[in-house]
């Protein structure tokens, strides 16, 4: 490694440790010529996953952006940050397992909504209201009705008791 102070190409590693995220290794090095110390980081050279926005722009997949959106949707809900991080991990794993390097925001959003629906319906509705960009209250109401109908026990829907889909 070339010394940033004197340009000499010989050094020795004084200390190595893994980062908190376990995605890089931090190395303290000492130049063999000037004896000054400097830090280097070693990271895996990952192939970026691109997200195709609705307007056609392409951006690198940003897990922090996804997590931030989920945290907003789950604010004041009984969902741990660990569960949300796992949800983002699953989404990233899905992207990595795929041969395709580009995914639309629509596909990623639908995947996240489906997972969020299983986790917490209120958070799902919050996320969907931003993601789906409902044009009016009726669209929002339809989504709620579909959610309520799908959550209702099958026996209540068949018998037509109060609150079921057959009462409409």
From Swiss-Prot:
Span of domain ATP-cone: 49-139
InterPro entries assigned to the protein according to its UniProt record, in alphabetical order: ATP-cone_dom, NrdR-like_N, RNR_NrdR-like
Cofactors (names): Zn(2+)
Zinc fingers typed unnamed, residue spans: 3-34
Cofactor info, note text: Binds 1 zinc ion.
Its job: Negatively regulates transcription of bacterial ribonucleotide reductase nrd genes and operons by binding to NrdR-boxes.
Family note: Belongs to the NrdR family.
Protein known as: Transcriptional repressor NrdR
Organism: Acidobacterium capsulatum (strain ATCC 51196 / DSM 11244 / BCRC 80197 / JCM 7670 / NBRC 15755 / NCIMB 13165 / 161)
Lineage: Bacteria, Pseudomonadati, Acidobacteriota, Terriglobia, Terriglobales
């Amino acid at each position: 490694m070339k010394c940033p102070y004197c340009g000499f190409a010989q050094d020795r590693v004084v200390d190595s440790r893994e980062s908190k995220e376990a995605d890089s290794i931090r190395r303290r090095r000492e130049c063999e010529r000037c004896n000054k110390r400097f830090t280097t980081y070693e990271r895996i050279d990952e192939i970026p996953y691109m997200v195709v926005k609705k307007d056609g722009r392409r951006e690198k997949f940003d897990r922090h952006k996804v997590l931030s959106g989920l945290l907003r949707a789950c604010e004041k809900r009984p969902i741990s940050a660990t569960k949300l991080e796992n949800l983002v991990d699953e989404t990233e794993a899905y992207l990595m397992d795929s041969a395709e390097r580009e995914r639309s925001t629509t596909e990623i959003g639908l995947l996240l909504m489906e997972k969020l629906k299983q986790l917490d319906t209120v958070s799902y509705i919050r996320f969907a209201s931003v993601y789906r960009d409902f044009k009016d209250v009726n669209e929002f109401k339809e989504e709620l009705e579909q959610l309520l109908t799908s959550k209702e026990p099958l026996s209540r829907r068949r018998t037509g008791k109060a609150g079921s889909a057959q009462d409409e």
